[in-house]
Each structure stands twice: as C-alpha cells, then as structure tokens.
Amino acid sequence: MSKLPRHIGAVLSALRLNGGRAEELGSLDDATWHALLAYTDSTHLTLYLAARARDFAPGWVRQRLAKNLSDNSRRFERIKAAYGEMAYAFRKAGVNHVVLKGFSQWPDYSEDLRLRLQSDIDFYCPPESIFQARDLLIGLGYKEVPTNSFADHLPIMIREGGWQWKGNYYDPDIPPMVELHHRLWNRERLRFGPSSLESFWSRRQVRRVEGIDFPALHWVDNLGFSALQVLRDLVNHGLLLHKVYELARFLDRNVDNKHFWQQWIELHDGPLRQWQAIAFRLAVQYFACDVAPQVADHIKQLPGFIEKWIVHSADSFLNPLENLTKDALWLHLALIDSAREKIAVGLRVLIPMKLQTDPEMVAITDDGTVSQPAFFQRLLRRAAYGTSRLPLHARLLPVTLWHGLRLWWSAREFKAQA
C-alpha cells in the first residue's frame, strides 16, 4: 500500500461516504489547495467535492468552485440540447440505441447531474443501426476523429466550430463529443469477462431525466455495466476515479434495497456478479461505502490473490503520475483462465511491441476544425513517441516482476492461514 500525498489523502477523506472528515480541508495551505484542485479536475471529482466540503475551503477556492459549478451547469444544458437534437434524428430514422453513462447515472450514481463533468454523449447501437447513426450525426455536422483501434466504439465524433481550449475543464462552450459503442465488453482484447451481454439490450427501458425521455439499460444492467467499466479501466491501467466514486454512491444508497439485489442475483449469473464484486471491493477501499449483504457475500468470495492485490496495489492508482506501475497486470492475469492467453497479455504489457499513438496527434485548430497531420508525419511522430517510452517500460519491468512475486507470496500465506 503506497503512501498518498496530503492533497490526495484529504480528497479521499472528504469524500468517504462513511466516516468522512471534510473538516481536514480547512488545514490545507494554498499550495496544497492548488495541487488538490489540479488532482480533482483530472479525476472529475472537483464538483462532487464542492458539494460535500466547500464550507471548509478558503474564499478563493469557494469562488473558483462556484464558477466551475456555474460553467458546468451551462454545459449540462448544452449536453441536453445536443442529445435532444440527436435523439430526434434517431427517432425519425428508426435508429435503435441506448444512452450509456452521462445523465443515465442519475439519481443513484450522481445526486445532481450538474455535479458530474460530462465531456461526451455515449450511445450503444446494435450492428444494424450503428452506421446509420453515424451517418445521421455526420448530417448534423459531426466529424470523426481517429480513435484507438481497440476502442469499444467507432471513431469519436465532434461538431466543428470556433471553440479553443482555454484550460477550463468546465467550459460551457466545449463542443460535446459523441461515442457510438458497438459492444459493451471487449472480451477479445481483455481475454476474460462475459462472452455476450445481449440480454442487456433485450432488457432496455425508457427513462426520464429533467424532461428528457431516453432509452437506457435496465437498472440492474446499468450497475453491471458501470462495474465492468471500472474493472476494464483498472486492468487497462487507466482507472477513472469518478467512476469508482459514483459506484460507491450507488452501493451506499441501495444497502437496504432488497428487491434490487434479488433482481441482481436473478438476472446476472455467478461469474458476472463476481467480476462486478471486484469493482465493488475497490469502491469500499477508496470511499468507505456501505454495501448490501448480498454484495458483502460476493466480496468475501473473491479469491485471496485478488483481495491481496486490492490491499497492496490498488492505492497506487490513486496517484498514477507519481506511482508509475504495471501492477494491474497481476490482477488481469488472475482473471484469465487460459495459460496461453495469460502469456499473451503478460508479454503485451511487459514488453510492448506496438508503438503507442501520440495523444496530441489530433487537434481542434484555431478556426475550430478537426485536424490531424499527414500520413508520413503521423508515422514519424508515432515512432518518436513510442520510442521515447521504451526506457520507461525497461525501468518498470523489474519492479513489476518483484511486485508480482510479492503478491503471489502474500496470497500463498493468506491461503495457508484460511
């Protein structure tokens, strides 16, 4: 378990759903507050922190948070308007879809959607509808930008305009992006998890939020999808902390919801519930949420190695810039059944052969258009970016192997004592 910087510890303490100590924020100096706000901006927790702890912040921080909230409220109105335009086009053309994440997380995951930083609108469309949906968005003025080939969605789409980045995460003028998902889980890439989530689509339902009617996942399936998103991000070394906080909030609010948890057991099979339980355990670790007895039972049934991994390694993901690690590999391998696939994933992570893409290869230019370098320039930049990361991979290799050995030994002792 890694020692956290003071500003990160203060954030977690303030956001704990049981036994939180928001008053600790009152003892922070300005330099620590600057570090804290940079951290909560990047983890999408700033507005959740403002709702729970703004009274303990100094005046300049309260002013900053008030502006962030005002900007994000205006941004949410823009998101609603953009969705309304898309939904009308989809409905008129008979394009089937469900809304994922975003405003579909109200009310159990996010008590106020104006506290949730939403940068894009996510849809899931079945194969027969997804390209029609894309073409309709192009007709509305959206343009595709390059996306990781392993993404679960088509290339991200964004409407061109005169917006420029000004360093404000909550800028109401940021044009909403759109992701058209063609799958809810990428077993081919991850080598574990559900082989099919078609039942999620068949159980979809219409919901209403602030005057918006939209198709969404069934409540139980939305929990499953949210938990799987956390697990996916975790093994992909890219955990987004606000997703864990929202999951913790759902668990805490539904401790006594016996009907919901009975449905959860009836609709999701044992392996699917156990994969979700890993994300639930992480939510307890980070945000001290209460859980229903059914959830507690599934957490207790997690293998000893996974429990030890969460205890020893999970906190490093709270401070990824300082704790560069590939420890997620050991959790990932523990979830894969096939020895052959374990080796494939291990080699992919420890000795990456494919050069990564420079994250700055796509930009919105001064006139608002989406641009990308020419092919040869992209090739050179990709090679330079990937090569520049080779020393990092070499440095992390022995550390990762040592951490894996330590985890294996700790889990072995745990099993012997059980």
Task: Tell what function each PLM region has.
Residues 1-119, 125-418:
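Conserved NTP-donor binding/palm subdomain of two-metal-ion nucleotidyltransferases/polymerases, i.e.
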